[in-house]
C-alpha cells in the first residue's frame, strides 16, 4: 500500500498549459465579477483556481454569502442547482452540465412522493445530494456535516423520513438511537469500500488510523477511528496526533489533506475488486479546459423554474437556520 502522491502527476507541457489556462481564468473572474466554487472531490488543478474549496455545506454557505455577479460551480449538478436556488438573480455556470450525481438520481420524484404520502405525518429530511424536485417535497435539507446536529433538534416522538442515502441515515440512526424511515439510495463511491479490503489495508499499514465518511457501509464504519463529513475528516487529519491515515472517502480530498499536512501519510482506502468504483467520475468531469470555456461562453447556465425554486428554497433555508 502506498501513500497518495501530490498532485496527480502531469508532464511539463501539461503543467505549462494548465498554468496558462489558470491565468486566463483569473482574468475572466475579474472581468465577470465571478466566484469559482469547487468541491474537494474535483481535480487538483480545479481546486487550485477556485476561490472557495469545500464540502457541500461550506459551498452552500459560500453560494449564499458572496457579492459576485456570476457563480461558477465545479462540482456535480445538484450543487450548482442549489446555488441557483439560493441565488435566482445571479448567473450560475457549470463546466459540464452532464456531471450528475447517481445518488441524487436514485430518488425519482414520483416514487419519493408516493413514499412520503404513505407516511403523511412524517417530517421529511433530505440530504443535499438530491434534486430540486426532491428538495421541494422536503421540510429540511441537510449535509453530512450537519445531519446529526439537525436531527438532534427534532423531537424523538416525531417520525422522520430520511433520504436518499441509506448509509448516512443508518449511521445517524445508530448514533442517536432513533428510528427513521430510510430511502434506499447510496453513493457508489462509498459503497465500493468493503470490510475485507479495508481490514487488509489496516493489516498492511498498522501505524495508520482508518477514517471514514458516513456514506460508507456500516461494515466499514465499525472499524473507523473517526467518522465524519469530508470537512470533518480533513480537520481531523490536521489536528490528530497520528501521522498516517487510511482514508475511506473519494480520494480527491487527499490533495487538500496532503497540502495541509505535508509531513503526514495519506492512503486511499482500497476498493472492492468486484466493484472498482471508488473514484467519482462525475466530479472528475470538471476540467480546467471546461471551466475556462464555460466562463468564456457564459454557458452552460443552470436554470431552475421559479415555482420549483421557491419550494426547494424552503428546506435549504431551514437547514442554514438550524446549522
UniProtKB/Swiss-Prot annotation:
GO terms for molecular function: 4 iron, 4 sulfur cluster binding; metal ion binding; quinolinate synthetase A activity. It catalyses: iminosuccinate + dihydroxyacetone phosphate = quinolinate + phosphate + 2 H2O + H(+). Pathway: Cofactor biosynthesis; NAD(+) biosynthesis; quinolinate from iminoaspartate: step 1/1. It is found in: Cytoplasm. Binds 1 [4Fe-4S] cluster per subunit. Keywords: 4Fe-4S, Cytoplasm, Iron, Iron-sulfur, Metal-binding, Pyridine nucleotide biosynthesis, Transferase. The keyword Endoplasmic reticulum does not apply. It comes from the Bacteria. Its cofactor is [4Fe-4S] cluster. Its main location: cytoplasm. InterPro entries: NadA, NadA_sf, Quinolinate_synth_type2. One of its GO terms (biological process) is 'de novo' NAD biosynthetic process from L-aspartate. GO terms for cellular component: cytosol. Pfam families: NadA (PF02445). PANTHER family: QUINOLINATE SYNTHASE, CHLOROPLASTIC, QUINOLINATE SYNTHETASE A. Catalyzes the condensation of iminoaspartate with dihydroxyacetone phosphate to form quinolinate. This is Quinolinate synthase. It comes from Chlorobium phaeobacteroides (strain DSM 266 / SMG 266 / 2430). The gene is nadA.
